[in-house]
Amino acid sequence: MPRTHAIEDYRNFGIMAHIDAGKTTTTERILYYTGKSHKIGEVHEGAATMDWMEQEQERGITITSAATTCFWRDKRLNIIDTPGHVDFTIEVERSLRVLDGAVCVLDGNQGVEPQTETVWRQADKYDVPRVVFVNKMDKIGADFFKCVADIIDRVAGKPVCLQLPVGAESSFRGVVDLIKMKAIIWSGEALGASFSEEEIPADLAEQAAEYRTKLIEACVELDDDAMAAYLDGVEPDEATLRKLVRVAVQRRAFHPVLCGSAFKNKGVQPLLDAVVDYLPSPADRGEIKGIDYKTEEEVVRKPSDSDPFSMLAFKIMDDPHVGTITFCRIYSGKVESGANLLNSTRDKRERVGRMLLMHANNREDIKEAYAGDIVALAGLKDTRTGDTLCDPNKAVILEKMEFPEPVIEIAVEPKSKADQEKLGIALSKLAAEDPSFRVSTDPESGQTILKGMGELHLDIKVDILKRTYKVEANIGQPQVAYREKLTRRTEVDYTHKKQTGGTGQFARVKLVVEPNEPGAGYSFESKIVGGAVPKEYIPGVEKGLQSVMTAGILAGFPVVDIKVELIDGAYHEVDSSALAFEIASRAALREALQKGGSVLLEPVMKVEVVTPEDYTGSVIGDLNSRRGQIQGQDMRGNATVINAMVPLANMFGYVNQLRSFTQGRANFTMQFDHYEEVPRGEAEKVVAKYA
């Protein structure tokens, strides 16, 4: 099937927001108006098209980013719906990596919320152009201008209004279009299909003129001819204004702001027009940089069908009917089903079996796909999130994604032998789908340990195990992922000798062990000269070191940020072996950790609590009692916002306690910030519990 749309007519964009800002509802309306859905799915009814996992429909939140293709004004829109809950930030990050633009949805009542800040920063990191949609304008307390001010104050954005609201709260009727200088009014509740253009209401005329001037001044800054004409008293016409807003979005000179109420079907069609008019196509975003697979030099791939084929896998899902589905963004070239590709990240060959175009969870088989497409491939064997797939003859590695370390873990014990087998299969699939979810086995108890980004993250994984994979299991209490770290440089000389009739064991190692920079991880270097330890025994030394790294000496937690040098040693012609050196290095490192003053590290979370003013004192007192350090507080509307750093160990069950002493009126978000040393008194308790 040849290309149906030129690459200039593609818009690959995501919808990003804080939880509950109305992101999924906005996507549902877009699908309805672009003709993909004949019935609108409401989130609060648990029927939204994009939220197709049972866990999402029950909880009313979006967990996985579903990808959907639809059409508006002869343009092809590929939409990625992203989760807004902080435990799923990884999903947002993966989606932004492959998008060309984004719509940032704000709750008209709440403005810029903590997760909005997080996704905004992630969009900055990947340089994603965006427009802002202030949603829920029909809600009590909705304040469009406060939202605009928030964009400046909280995320250092550059908002420029393209619309103003007509009416507010329950009397919200439509918007003033500042480019056309007309009011767009929606009448009745007939799914918003009927709207009319009218003159701007008299009471808004002055405000509209003021904001149109701001819009024009922001636009003419970008074009010398338009600026010269404007200084001569000639305003840019409608087409020029649209062109300049498009330039501004592409250059990230400013962020256009629109408004509406997706739930009440008002403002969605102009939002779709803005996506088409202002967000970039893959061609506008230009070439993508990569590394040549053979020479390791930087190369580029242009967004063109004639360039060598390259694409990035950004999400993996397990589908009950098709098996493993890998979502990919094609950056250059074209691909046909049946093609043989190279996974250049892992040096593995992959064959493209079925190629699918996805609509939430319906699918359409396609035979060919082109630069700019977002497709789902069934049956890839070795591909993981962040891998590059490309033409084997012109191989390239596109930039890799970075994934955060998990900070919380739970133990899982299957109830029967059959459950044990099902658990193994299920966990390998879940870990492949989500790089921020890790699975390991406790070396002492043999228990399976699940690690994730927060309580909700692990709750949902356990839910999927029980429902989708029918695994019956006992689930332990959540535990903090502590770490151990050396505090000072130390030198150790250790000899392992064992003589029991016949061949004995002999190995001597001399190590220098010192702390590494925070976040630098583990490094090992052999400085052996003159064959004091033969080369074939060095891997044995490393193996011994790494076995201690996984379980430190204080309480069996992983050892981080450590640098080990092997500076000397000795061996015996007959009695030495790789195993003897493994045993020697293991004992030597344990001794070094004892001598080098090992300490315990704990994850510290960045916590934001939004509370009515009356409860401010109680909230701060409670955070202090949890070893929290208050970083600051400010007002947001009539609520107080408190920012603090609190150890994760003291935050379990916080949601219920916060609800109880604020009568359910406060809410909070938290995300991992850094590791720091546990105070001695607390460390003794932790060691007593785990050692």
UniProtKB/Swiss-Prot annotation:
GO molecular function, one term: translation elongation factor activity
One GO BP: ribosome disassembly
Residue ranges constituting the tr-type G domain according to the UniProt record: 8-283
Subcellular localization, as worded in the UniProt entry: Cytoplasm
Pfam families xrefs: EF-G_D2, EFG_C, EFG_III, EFG_IV, GTP_EFTU
Coiled coil region boundaries: none
Domain of life: Bacteria
Positions annotated to bind GTP: 17-24, 81-85, 135-138
Keywords for this protein: Cytoplasm, Elongation factor, GTP-binding, Nucleotide-binding, Protein biosynthesis
Gene Ontology CC terms: cytoplasm
Family named by the database record: Belongs to the TRAFAC class translation factor GTPase superfamily. Classic translation factor GTPase family. EF-G/EF-2 subfamily.
Function: Catalyzes the GTP-dependent ribosomal translocation step during translation elongation. During this step, the ribosome changes from the pre-translocational (PRE) to the post-translocational (POST) state as the newly formed A-site-bound peptidyl-tRNA and P-site-bound deacylated tRNA move to the P and E sites, respectively. Catalyzes the coordinated movement of the two tRNA molecules, the mRNA and conformational changes in the ribosome.
PANTHER family for the chain: RIBOSOME-RELEASING FACTOR 2, MITOCHONDRIAL (PTHR43261:SF1), TRANSLATION ELONGATION FACTOR G-RELATED (PTHR43261)
Designated name of the protein: Elongation factor G
